[in-house]
Amino acid sequence: MQEVISYIQKAVLEISNALKFPDTSYSQNQNFTGDTQLKFDVLSDEIITKTLSQCSSIKAIISEEKDEILTLNEKAKLIVAYDPLDGSSLMDVNFAIGSIFAIYEEKASAKKLRAALYSMYGARLELVICKEQPKLYRLNANNEFIFIKDLKINEKGKINATGGTQKFWEEKHAKFIKSLFDEGYRLRYSGAMVSDINQILLKGGGIFSYPATQDAPNGKLRAFFEVFPLAFIIEKAGGKTTNGKNHSLLELEFDKIHATTPCFFGSKYEISKLLKAYNE
């Protein structure tokens, strides 16, 4: 496991260096789910593929930017699924973006998720690594990731990060969001899931939501690359997650590697309030 994490650190550092002078234009290609790829999406995916291919502990890799699973070593046990550059559409406005990684054992399944990581490419390069407790690391002047602190979520937060086009929201979701604002919650939504989840973790609580909508009844966020790893981190930090029905996103099972799901992450208070609103 530690060997895999060390190779992920190498990939993250290389992506961070490449971001100093990036090409923010679009390519002529689309990924599996129909998103037009930025040239830097492709480059980030190539960097991660190249780096992880050198690790003998990895059985296979699954990328948001690839159609199929890429087998590396049949004798190994660990599978790495990743979003090479979450929030890449925000590159042209210079918002913070990141990479998300899930490490599964034997098969890609929430029940087999053993560790999760994400990087933040912002004013600083930071990395959150979670096996049992999410731990925040920061790159220092010597190009070393230094431990900063454990991350924990309070019972109740103040941040409301909600995605999806509002005119396509279900009425129950619109009412729930309004109830949060009526309680004094602050809107904090960037358009990059990893950045919004990171803020909730570092600020100690709140809620991130990307609901089912009329134009995306199964949600838009991908289970294996985005939803499962970030749900793993949130729950290990003391928070809760749900799809609006289940009591944890990590209870969900999917057959397709690019499957999507509605998803909600946050403090216990907000998720309990959401489940009540959704199931009245």
From Swiss-Prot:
Binding site for substrate: D86, G87, S88, S89, Y189, K220
Recorded family membership: Belongs to the FBPase class 1 family.
Listed cofactors: Mg(2+)
Gene3D superfamilies assigned to the protein according to its UniProt record, in alphabetical order: 3.40.190.80, Fructose-1,6-Bisphosphatase, subunit A, domain 1
Identification of the protein by name: Fructose-1,6-bisphosphatase class 1
Binding site for Mg(2+) 1: E64, D83, L85
GO molecular function terms attached to this record: fructose 1,6-bisphosphate 1-phosphatase activity; magnesium ion binding
Pathway entry: Carbohydrate biosynthesis; gluconeogenesis
Cofactor: binding details: Binds 2 magnesium ions per subunit.
Gene: fbp
Source organism of the structure: Campylobacter jejuni subsp. doylei (strain ATCC BAA-1458 / RM4099 / 269.97)
Main location per the UniProt record: cytoplasm
A biological process from GO: sucrose biosynthetic process
Keyword annotations of the record: Carbohydrate metabolism, Cytoplasm, Hydrolase, Magnesium, Metal-binding
Sequence positions that bind Mg(2+) 2: D83, D86, E226
E.C. code: 3.1.3.11
Entries under InterPro entries matching the protein: FBPase_C_dom (IPR044015), FBPase_class-1 (IPR000146), FBPase_N (IPR033391), FBPtase (IPR028343), SBPase (IPR023079)
UniProt-annotated location(s): Cytoplasm
